[in-house]
């Protein structure tokens, strides 16, 4: 499918640089596929759900994956910025660095901003391998929990490029760029639909009879990568590690058998649920990497409703929502959102999408 079909123009003023306050005051565009677009706010979410429905949230926790350092292995030093994108083992990470041209295999980087050190001393890493587009393999001097603590001491929240390009990260982002469900460290980008939730909203959802289930998908930096090919068939999707427990699978299957709907909070929860779903729609336990790439024509097995933010043009995530609710429907919804001043991307507003009626699997 041609990728230019998923392109649109977004005025810069529609890009949110800070989240709404309180979080549930963010706007929410309800898209049911009946041709009517309804402007609401996130606090209204319980009104659109029924007793027995199950919300599925991602409990991944964003690590302080943005590191500043200096190349110290040559006569002249060079400033280096690194974003950790994937843990390889106890002491090695895959990272994106800039300027990549100043690094070669064997170089040593000493991390710490303006002379700052962690409790254990300097955090040094050796460039073990170098790939394309600034990608390197870093081997750190620390291992396991000691390395985790050093990264936490020295790192900063890895804000998306469309925010970081307009302002530096600050202490407020450490709280803002983390969901209330965050529990399991490993993400280098937030599952942003979850940012809209507050304890008060969760309480109202439970009072409505809506269940809440947790899954884990460690969001990688690949979520921000553009689709550079002209046809979706040529795009290679990034892999992310996810986990869905047997208990959660059983709860979701039981709820669906009783007529409840599965509501994915975010595209990360959606991708994990669809990865775990069997051909008949049964959700199975899952613990592995997934590189599922959802485009129009995909037959959804697990998810009935999707709550998500507004995504980048020509991105895999806009392709996903177009597959779920229909390309023409989403083109109209996004045009309405832009005209109406909705705020886009990670800190922006939400939309609540109902699956195209002919897409739900009828179980035997």
UniProtKB/Swiss-Prot annotation:
Q: Which UniProt keywords apply?
A: Cytoplasm, Queuosine biosynthesis, S-adenosyl-L-methionine, Transferase
Does the UniProt entry include the keyword Transferase?
yes
Main EC class the enzyme belongs to: transferase
Q: Which domain of life is it from?
A: Bacteria
Please provide, in alphabetical order, the Gene Ontology terms of the cellular component aspect for this entry: cytoplasm
Q: Which reaction does it catalyse?
A: 7-aminomethyl-7-carbaguanosine(34) in tRNA + S-adenosyl-L-methionine = epoxyqueuosine(34) in tRNA + adenine + L-methionine + 2 H(+)
Localization per Swiss-Prot or TrEMBL:
Cytoplasm
Query: What SUPFAM superfamilies has UniProt attached to this entry?
Result: QueA-like
One Pfam family of this chain? Queuosine_synth
One annotated GO molecular function is: S-adenosylmethionine:tRNA ribosyltransferase-isomerase activity
The record's EC number reads 2.4.99.17
S-adenosyl-L-methionine recorded as keyword = yes
Q: What is its main location?
A: cytoplasm
**Pathways per UniProt:** tRNA modification; tRNA-queuosine biosynthesis
Swiss-Prot/TrEMBL GO biological process terms = queuosine biosynthetic process; tRNA wobble guanine modification
Q: State the disulfide connectivity.
A: none
The protein's assembly and partners: Monomer.
The family this protein is said to belong to: Belongs to the QueA family.
Record function comment: Transfers and isomerizes the ribose moiety from AdoMet to the 7-aminomethyl group of 7-deazaguanine (preQ1-tRNA) to give epoxyqueuosine (oQ-tRNA).
Q: What is this protein called?
A: S-adenosylmethionine:tRNA ribosyltransferase-isomerase
What's the source species for this entry? Bradyrhizobium sp. (strain BTAi1 / ATCC BAA-1182)
